[in-house]
């Protein structure tokens, strides 16, 4: 797998590199933030719970310091120059609730006031296979959290990304393949049993995110837009709904443990695809825009549905109209 130490390091005293990461306080996002910080980035961690993010920041600071000392001691030799205490970035918290579009706009506005450019936007946050629920904005909760809120967040921050020819990395999932034919996003799959049809809702949201990435690459060719499947990361809060179910929760816990043992990757390994897309200098808008990467940063191909440009355009148009109907101009 990719060793992130071979990727470029920046000196924040010389060059101010800015990254924005949604859901950066746990799991894959935590390690994405850690490595961006080690590489000299000013990182804005966007999430709902200030206490959890403050705790995550302290843990990341401690882990980064530990890794810098290990690298200095030669106990953890890498292929690249390695991190340095003198070249670490900085970490900041932005309140972001993806189930509230007005909150999403406020978060973007705050960043617009704080910075004049963004080098990397990582749309990392998401939920998976939860019960059917509608948000206050009138969208199915998985669709809004995984796709629609990230759509409007990205569009609001786009001027800062275009200012420095930045990069947009959106975390999809291999689960998007469950959308085996194009479904209108207004379809909620309100059928029983939920434990079956919730996966179709999840697949729709992750397919839409890839389609959005494809359309961004077409509409804004000066920004590198990429989508990733991080790998089968089983040690994640995404599965908490299933493992906490009465009676059958223990069955799902055992199932996820077995799948993780044979096929899974760690949270840090799951962050590698995002890190490659964010930092690899060999990626360019000319040859890589709109591509899809999988575990460890390997280039791959997403589903037929997600690659269909006409259907991607339909998803884009539907999203813009839905947001305008709710008072959000795109």
From Swiss-Prot:
Deletion: any effect?
Exhibits lumenal vesicles within vacuoles suggestive of vacuole fusion/fission defects. Leads to internal accumulation of precursor CPY.
Query: Which Gene Ontology terms of cellular component type are present?
Result: lipid droplet; membrane; mitochondrion; vacuole
> Does this entry carry the keyword Glycoprotein?
yes
Task: Provide the glycosylation site positions.
Answer: 282
The membrane spanning regions, by residue number, are: 27-47, 245-265
- Topology relative to the membrane, per the entry? Multi-pass membrane protein
Where would you find this protein in the cell?
Lipid droplet; Membrane
UniProt entry keywords in alphabetical sequence: Glycoprotein, Lipid droplet, Membrane, NADP, Oxidoreductase, Transmembrane, Transmembrane helix
Residues annotated for NADP(+) binding in this entry: 28, 97, 124, 202, 206, 233, 237
Question: Any one Gene Ontology biological process term?
Answer: vacuolar protein processing
Q: Does the keyword Membrane apply?
A: yes
Q: What are the recorded GO MF terms, alphabetically?
A: oxidoreductase activity
The superkingdom listed in its UniProt entry is Eukaryota
Gene3D superfamilies the record matches: NAD(P)-binding Rossmann-like Domain
**Which sites are catalytic?**
172 (proton donor), 202 (proton donor), 206 (lowers pka of active site tyr)
EC number(s) per entry: 1.1.1.-
- The protein's predominant localisation is other
Q: Which InterPro entries match?
A: NAD(P)-bd_dom_sf (IPR036291), SDR_fam (IPR002347)
What does the PTM comment state?
N-glycosylated.
Its annotated function is as follows: Probable dehydrogenase required for replication of Brome mosaic virus. Involved in vacuolar processing and morphology.
| Remaining remarks | Present with 892 molecules/cell in log phase SD medium.
In the record, the note on similarity to other proteins reads: Belongs to the short-chain dehydrogenases/reductases (SDR) family.
Please identify the protein, giving its name as recorded.
Probable oxidoreductase ENV9
Q: Which organism is it from?
A: Saccharomyces cerevisiae (strain ATCC 204508 / S288c) (Baker's yeast)
Q: Which gene encodes it?
A: ENV9
